[in-house]
Amino acid sequence: MADVSIEKLASDIGTTVDRLVGQFKDAGISKSAGEQVNEDEKQKLLDHLSKQHGSAAEPTRMTLKRKTTSTLSVGKSKEVKVEVRKKRTYVKRSDIEEQQRQAEEEAKRLEEEARLKREAEEKAAAEAKKAAEEKARKAQEAKKAAEEERVRRAEQAKKEAEARKKDEPELTEAEKAEAEAARQEEERLRKAQEEEAQKKLEEDAKKAADEARKLAEENERRWKEEEERRKKAEAEEVHLHSNRYAQEAEDEEDMQVERSSRRRRKSKKNAGEHLKQGFNKPAAPVERVVKLGATITVGELASKLAIKSNEVIKTMMKMGEMATINQVLDQDTAVLVIEEMGHKYELVNDNALEDELLADGTDGEKTSRAPVVTIMGHVDHGKTSLLDYIRRAKVADGEAGGITQHIGAYKVQTDNGEITFLDTPGHAAFTAMRARGATATDIVILVVAADDGVMPQTKEAVQHARAAGVPLIVAVNKMDKETADPDRVKTELSQLEVISEEWGGEHQFCNVSAKTGMGVDELLEAIVLQSELLDLQAVAEGPGRGIVIESRLDKGRGPVASVLVQEGQLRAGDILLCGEEYGRVRAMRDENGKDMKLAGPSTPVEVLGLSGVPVAGEDAAVVKDERKAREVAAKRHQKKRELKLARQQKAKLENMFANMESGDVSELNIVLKADVQGSVEAISESLIKLSTSEVKVNIVGSGVGGITETDATLAAASGAIVLGFNVRADATARRVLEAEEIDLRYYSVIYNLIDEVKAAMSGMLAPEFKQEIIGLAEVRDVFKSPKLGAIAGCMVTEGNVKRSNPIRVLRDNVVIYEGELESLRRFKDDVQDVRNGMECGIGVKNYNDVKVGDQIEVFEIVEVKREI
């Protein structure tokens, strides 16, 4: 071929000119764009690229597949084709030898490195040992030289003393004593110096000997490790190159030798013990003691009884209870099953860990504490203004700008003592406390505007206070207005059974004005008087206990909980357990935002450091063990989850019977709202009259107007259903009702409302079932079907015959079989039912002994509910 240009060659092979020029350069050929390329240069480039990419190397492994086909005669005229496939892999011998050679060289290299390393370590150890010996020898020589120097100095001093004694005249007694004392002092100092030098030499020698010993021990340990590693590698190498079956045989032989040597070591005295039967037949039935908590599954019960689960299920079926292996049994059912199976039980407390953790109670001397007061009322009745006046007059005296309340709670100092106020907007925390049976609130102040009278939310506040069982003090506000009418307020509240002391009741009424401050001191005195009547006391020492007023998630500080301490003391650094959350108190702040180190009873504080945001209304307690606190919090979370799953259908009208059975609902709680007061009174009276000895209707709350968030929280706290008569729920209330899964029903006719509540109460009673005959057919002939067996040709004499209904086969008016109608045909068509006077073919499921003259009775099971 003729020479081609660089551009043409690059275009033919599909690459760029620059890359091709670079490849020529790598091959040792200098080319540039525009030059020509001859055949020799092409061949050189091709050889270079082949070597570079490895294509010039010879194959090291080759696999050949062969297939041969032959014919095998089977019998006289039958032949079978046999195909034999063979696969052979050939490996280049030089490669194997090269690999073995490389492995041997690598092993030699590693062995040489190990030898050199070992020699270096031995040499270092020898040098260290020699250095230590040399150091010890020098120390010994120094010691000997010091001893000789000491002896020489002593001799010299003795000679000098004798010379001085000869030359000097006779000394007096005082001079002799002074000279003797000087000599003794000099001798003492010399001995001290010699002892110090001797001690230093001994320490240096001992230190050198210790270093040499440690180095020798370290080298000896490393040599042993190297030797063990080398032996292990040699053993592994032997096994790697040995046959697998030979290795297994060798291991088996070693095990047999070990077993035989073990048998030889055993004494003949104990040989007879192994020949005895290991199982002894029980002389009496095994009686087990099962520890029972509140609930237990069938599988867990079987495991504790050491029997199979189907045995427990059989026993329950004999007792008339159907169950599965994962079904949860309550404590009473489990007790009956255990007693039926002949075992014993022991009731245990599921909250043992929690009780143990909280056992360190505040046992001590009780002292009086400040009352906890909650102020409730309509937002337009001056509640906020009254709070602001109390805070400005009693808390922020002398402080510019007043005080910003951080935690919804604060203390007021009066002449008669302290008062703790709780600000619970929306009454959410108050309702949660009442639902948990808490006693955080001691007194409720009801604020009512003198010019506006009792409003619907005022009635709701009265219902909340009455449900919580706390005393009520009425503050009639806005008395500075000309239209103020306190007598009207007393009259309207008397309809709610809130009677003033002036009218012979038990509730205190105070006329106040948040604008002018009139009556505020009298209100505070009334609170103090009421608290003295209640005789409020608490233990001031010991671990603190309280309740969570409110909680939130602060962006900069994390979970923040407002806690009202009820007993004991809460300190910074304590481990606090609040419901499902726990943590160490990192910081505490009071209502002014100032840091606190200690909080006593009736003191509200803001706590930082919890693991999460606790629920408002949860109990808070100081514990000692953080690990146990974490376990209790996790267990509470699990228990809450199980309870939530168990009460998915709680407060549903259709499931009242199930709730009654489980003991969750002992009465039908209702929150009733209507458009006018007359309807509320009429419906309440009618519903209460429906109560019987078995089922009781309890009107938890009632009022006029739309269904609000307060009604929803009240229903959630008391497990009630919400009934609305010509009213509707607002968006906030609907969100709460959906979140708590509370049943909400609207009515416009009073009779429909009463009938449905009556039906719900009837649903609490056990239903009855009865069988109702719907058709009768007489067998006229019997046919055989290959698919269905015996088919009865029948004439329907009474009622209708329906497909897939339960049936009975009667012979001489005696029931001989009870089953299900499987096939129903008229002529050749499948039909769903056949009326009276028509012929049909009936196939009875799993029964073929049908005879002419039999009667087939078709029936259905009807549930008959008990009604009140």
Curated annotation (Swiss-Prot):
Q: Where is this region: G4?
A: 477-480
What Gene3D superfamilies would the database entry show?
A: P-loop containing nucleotide triphosphate hydrolases, Putative DNA-binding domain, N-terminal subdomain of bacterial translation initiation factor IF2, Translation factors, Translation initiation factor IF- 2, domain 3
Where do the segments described as G2 lie? 402-406
Annotated spans, G1: 377-384
Which residues of the sequence carry a binding annotation for GTP? 377-384, 423-427, 477-480
Cystine crosslinks: none
Q: Name one GO molecular function term.
A: GTP binding
Leader peptide range in chain numbering: none
UniProt keyword annotations, A-Z: Cytoplasm, GTP-binding, Initiation factor, Nucleotide-binding, Protein biosynthesis
Principal location: cytoplasm
List the residue ranges of the region (G3). 423-426
Q: Where in the cell is it found?
A: Cytoplasm
* NCBIfam families (alphabetical): IF-2, small_GTP
Q: Report the sequence similarity comment from the record.
A: Belongs to the TRAFAC class translation factor GTPase superfamily. Classic translation factor GTPase family. IF-2 subfamily.
Q: What is this protein called?
A: Translation initiation factor IF-2
| Species name | Alteromonas mediterranea (strain DSM 17117 / CIP 110805 / LMG 28347 / Deep ecotype)
